[in-house]
């Protein structure tokens, strides 16, 4: 009946992560997740654009709805935010969504492409920043209400 449109994998920072096991090799300086504050790694982040467009969601900010869900997940789990290693394109999507992500370090992937080790804070203020400047803010607020009840 339903089809998966987007998703992300969350791993508590106290467990082995892609950052600690794999991605650390792509950075000049050691990158580690803090284990003294509640946070997580986010990986396997995706949005199926074909599925979005074929399900009459074209023009709807589905990526921002995913970002709201990520924030709600963190807030409910008392995480201060998420750490990730992302491509230049993904970093640009976060910035375009008005999410004030912090670049901790730049690195190079195995393909020689620039990647970023980033921190994405999670809070009600971040959610407001993501929603406030979007022309579909009413739709995003509706999605937010659904997400709060999950």
Give names to the regions the model predicted.
Residues 1-2, 50, 121-126:
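Short loop segments at secondary-structure junctions
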Residues 13-101, 105-107, 111-115:
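Acyl-donor binding region in acyl/amide transferases
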Residues 105-150:
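Accessory, usually C-terminal, subdomains that scaffold auxiliary metal cofactors
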Residues 3-12:
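Conserved beta-strand in the GNAT
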């Amino acid at each position: 009946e339903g089809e998966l449109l987007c998703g992300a994998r969350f791993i508590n920072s106290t467990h082995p992560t892609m950052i600690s096991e794999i991605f650390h090799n792509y950075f000049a300086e050691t990158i580690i997740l803090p284990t003294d504050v509640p946070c997580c790694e986010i990986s396997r982040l995706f949005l199926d654009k074909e599925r979005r467009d074929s399900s009459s969601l074209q023009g709807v900010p589905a990526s921002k709805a995913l970002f709201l869900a990520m924030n709600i997940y963190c807030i409910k789990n008392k995480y201060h935010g998420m750490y990730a290693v992302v491509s230049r394109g993904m970093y640009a999507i976060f910035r375009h969504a008005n999410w004030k992500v912090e670049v901790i370090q730049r690195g190079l992937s195995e393909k020689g492409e620039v990647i970023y080790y980033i921190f994405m804070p999670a809070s009600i203020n971040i959610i407001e920043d993501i929603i406030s400047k979007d022309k579909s803010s009413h739709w995003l607020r509706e999605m937010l209400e659904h997400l709060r009840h999950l």
